């Protein structure tokens, strides 16, 4: 398990094989994705496409300055990362719109 600053330093975990597959597919490391969860300006919604378990989707800025989309589930007091990718132009625009007030 990896400790992250999300929500006051709760634990983050992921399957190493899933993390490697995610990096090959999306070019995003889970270690970077967990930093997006610490973004105070992140947008988070419940994943409407998940029927099996309650999942969450966060659009946030990672430590490298990339806007990422991170999917995860809560396992007790631990965040279990499921997938992470770079935001589409539309998702990035939605994230940035919150600063235009």
Predicted regions and their residues:
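Ribonuclease/tRNase effector modules and their secretory precursors
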Residues: 1-101
């Amino acid at each position: 398990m990896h400790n992250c600053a999300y929500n006051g330093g709760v634990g983050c975990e992921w399957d190493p094989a899933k993390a490697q597959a995610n990096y090959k597919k999306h070019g995003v490391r889970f270690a970077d994705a967990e930093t997006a969860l610490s973004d105070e300006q992140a947008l988070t919604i419940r994943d409407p496409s998940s029927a099996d378990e309650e999942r969450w989707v966060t659009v946030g800025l990672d430590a490298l300055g990339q806007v990422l989309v991170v999917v995860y589930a809560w396992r007790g007091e631990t965040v279990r990362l499921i997938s992470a990718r770079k935001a589409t132009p539309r998702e990035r625009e939605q994230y940035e719109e919150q600063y235009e007030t």
